[in-house]
Amino acid sequence: MPSMDIVSEVDEVELRNAVDNSVRELKSRFDFRGKDASIEYKDHVVTLSAEDDFQCQQLVDILRMQLSKRNVDPASMDVDDKSVHSGKTFSLKVRFKEGIEVLTAKKLVKIIKDSKLKVQSSIQGDSVRVTGKKRDDLQAVMTLARESGLDQPFQFNNFRD
């Protein structure tokens, strides 16, 4: 009986590569020459700091673009609403969503059940296990999860026949 897990995780290596590429782009951008701006990555949190709020938003855009180039879904970013002002720098913290929260998992299971596909889904910690009789049903669930609009990127692993 085919089964798979629906998870939400960020590839640590690709995230680090995207941050490194963002730092490289920051150093080469003309509008940041002579400005005090930085991008730092530590403990799954990216800290963006610049001299004003507008530049912080530009740093978010640079990071978002580099993430999409490295095939990391920018929807997994959780950016602070307001930048923190300390001294003469503004800083933003960007966290990345890992795992599926219980509320989101319940919504996903409800969407799967409402689709009338012949599959069973169950919540297992921070993932959702889906089993069905046909591989085609699981592929339909993959499409359904991607198009669900739950503000969270999903990956599919442990695909077994």
From Swiss-Prot:
Keywords: Nucleotide-binding. The keyword Nucleotide-binding applies. Transmembrane segments: none annotated. Disulfide bonds: none annotated. SUPFAM superfamilies: YajQ-like. GO terms for cellular component: cytosol. One of its GO terms (molecular function) is nucleotide binding. NCBIfam families: PRK05412.1. HAMAP family: YajQ. Nucleotide-binding protein. Belongs to the YajQ family. This is Nucleotide-binding protein Swoo_3646. It comes from Shewanella woodyi (strain ATCC 51908 / MS32).
